[in-house]
A protein has these predicted regions:
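Helix-loop-helix hairpin linking two adjacent transmembrane segments in secondary transporters
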Residues: 78-126
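Extracytoplasmic gate region of multi-pass secondary transporters
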Residues: 150-207
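C-terminal transmembrane helical hairpin of 12-TM major facilitator-type secondary transporters
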Residues: 192-204, 209-262
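Intracellular juxtamembrane helix-capping segments at the cytosolic ends
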Residues: 53-67, 254-267
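A late C-terminal transmembrane helix in Major Facilitator Superfamily
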Residues: 86, 266-303, 311
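Interfacial helix-cap and linker-helix signal at transmembrane-aqueous boundaries
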Residues: 7-8, 88-100, 177-178, 208-209, ...
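C-terminal ends and interior cores of transmembrane alpha-helices
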Residues: 22-35, 224-236
Length: 341
């Protein structure tokens, strides 16, 4: 993703969707024919490196800079598609697996993705703002008080803890519920509801960034995510579990949109794709760390209480970093205002 961010800032994203459409559908079809674990890992590497990585951060940067009015809403709507896919596609694949088996499911996935993605990919155009910035020999004039490097440093550090917090329920909610006596169907339905509420959370999280500011939106959604994640192991009623799942899904997805809006509003168009790719890199690291942490603490204690309490603690660390970031911005802004006077 970081490599594609550099390429996108230098050459644009005009053909990214088209390349990704063929890469992902081709990888899915090849997976239907794989016969070894090395082929399995290799094909998923191709799927991620030449597919998913090309249609996430670089295209988010493109979308964000297409809109000067309500860019947060535009990014939120774009990001919400991922939440819908995370809820619906696994459910449909599970039905297909039961009916047709894994090979046919991979082939159907490849055909469906190509049929859906190819026409959309042909419509992608580079945003005029990014295209103009790329052609200008001098850097854009920025009004944000911190340098782009410092902005990316703050967001990257925060996002590690933020994504560590959110990935614990995403990875461990289903086993937590099945261990608590829920059936697998009930547990996966809760996860699907969580993801679907995330689609709305991404839209409203982006819009909130337009209304109250990018960083305040990030902090509000982070607080909601941190407060809600703690309660999962201590709930015993179905209604309470669904309620907390909806709240967590809404806020964790709002966090994801808020991160995109922060990056969009704090860096220049010329640096946008690289910035989003770098922060996403650290976000994926945090997602992996959270999944590992939740499993490790479960193995250590024999229950999920420590895992979800650990998620809340790293969520608090994330919020503290964001608070320091906000104070740093305020202090730097005051210093610049005093210099101007």
């Amino acid at each position: 993703g970081v490599l594609w961010g550099y390429i996108a800032d230098r050459y644009g994203t005009r053909w990214f969707g088209l390349i990704a459409a063929f890469a992902m559908s081709g990888s899915l079809f090849a997976l239907s024919q794989q016969e070894s674990i090395l082929q399995f890992y290799g094909l998923y590497f191709l799927f991620g490196a030449f597919g998913n990585a090309m249609v996430t951060s670089p295209l988010f940067a493109n979308v964000g800079f297409w809109f000067t009015h309500k860019p947060g809403l535009a990014l939120g709507i774009t990001a919400s598609g991922g939440a819908v896919g995370q809820a619906v596609v696994p459910y449909l694949c599970a039905l297909s697996l039961e009916q047709y088996g894994w090979q046919t499911t991979y082939m159907l996935s490849a055909a469906c993705y190509l049929a859906l993605a190819l026409p959309v990919a042909l419509l992608i155009r580079e945003s005029p703002g990014r295209e103009l910035a790329r052609l200008q020999p001098v850097d854009e004039v920025r009004t944000f008080p911190l340098s782009e490097r410092e902005v990316i440093m703050w967001i990257s550090v925060a996002i590690i803890f933020c994504c560590t917090c959110m990935s614990v329920p995403i990875v461990h909610l289903v086993p937590l519920l099945t261990d608590s006596g829920f059936s697998l169907d009930e547990a996966t339905t809760v996860l699907m509801v969580l993801m679907l509420s995330g689609a709305l959370g991404r839209v409203l999280g982006g819009r909130l960034g337009d209304l109250i500011g990018a960083l305040p939106s990030y902090m509000v959604m982070s607080a909601g995510q941190t407060l809600s994640v703690f309660w999962f192991p201590f709930l015993d009623s179905t209604e309470a579990i669904y309620l907390v799942a909806v709240v967590f899904g809404f806020t964790y997805s709002g966090v994801m949109s808020a991160i995109l809006v922060c990056t969009r509003m704090m860096v220049s168009a010329k640096f946008g794709a690289r910035a989003m790719s770098i922060t996403s890199f650290f976000g994926w690291f945090g997602m992996g760390a959270g999944g590992f942490m939740g499993g490790y603490l479960f193995d250590l204690t024999g229950n999920y209480e420590a895992s979800f309490m650990g998620a809340m603690i790293v969520g608090c660390v994330n919020f503290a970093i964001l608070l320091l970031f906000a104070l740093r911005i305020r202090r730097q802004s005051r210093g610049l205002d005093e210099q101007a006077v």
